[in-house]
């Protein structure tokens, strides 16, 4: 059990039978009321983000998560296959377990597979990934780096906003936390 006063970003906790990671934490002290702790939590199974307020004297169970580096192999149906980089053991995760992470998976990419009580429960993506643009409007003459933006569909099916000078076939660096264009690769 861990006190809610000891929360920090990145901490994993168990709440209502689900595993959550703390994204943001704020200690709030009311003038005449009891202090509270407001947290933003991400469900590691579904990817849903919730906000929750705890009383400052509450305790919650800490979830101990193990990580193993693995390479994404392929998708079959709604199952995604990974191979451990050290033991060469294969892991199978469902689309539901991966959530939004499927938008960044490309065969051969290395990710961290998250384990809780010996079972794979999800993955942790690198901060950025390189993906190819497969569909976007053509750039017009005079488009500059400081211009506007346009939607672009990437090889995984993800659609993001990119600068006007990006063309089909360009490789772009995408921030996996915010689904945003970073730079041309």
UniProtKB/Swiss-Prot annotation:
Subcellular location: Cytoplasm
SMART domains membership: EFP, Elong-fact-P_C
Domain of life of the source: Bacteria
GO BP, one annotated term: peptide biosynthetic process
A cellular component term, taken from the record's GO annotations: cytoplasm
GO molecular function annotations of the record: translation elongation factor activity
Gene3D superfamilies hit by this protein: 2.30.30.30, Nucleic acid-binding proteins
Keywords in alphabetical order: Cytoplasm, Elongation factor, Protein biosynthesis
One Pfam family matching this protein: Elong-fact-P_C
InterPro entries: Elong-fact-P_C, NA-bd_OB-fold, Rib_uL2_dom2, Transl_elong_fac_P/YeiP, Transl_elong_KOW-like, Transl_elong_P/YeiP_cen, Transl_elong_P/YeiP_CS, Transl_elongation_fac_P
Pathway named in the protein's UniProt entry: Protein biosynthesis; polypeptide chain elongation
Protein role: Involved in peptide bond synthesis. Stimulates efficient translation and peptide-bond synthesis on native or reconstituted 70S ribosomes in vitro. Probably functions indirectly by altering the affinity of the ribosome for aminoacyl-tRNA, thus increasing their reactivity as acceptors for peptidyl transferase.
PANTHER family: ELONGATION FACTOR P, ELONGATION FACTOR P (EF-P) FAMILY PROTEIN
Similarity remark: Belongs to the elongation factor P family.
Designated name of the protein: Elongation factor P
Species annotation: Dictyoglomus thermophilum (strain ATCC 35947 / DSM 3960 / H-6-12)
Lineage: Bacteria, Pseudomonadati, Dictyoglomota, Dictyoglomia, Dictyoglomales
GN (gene name): efp
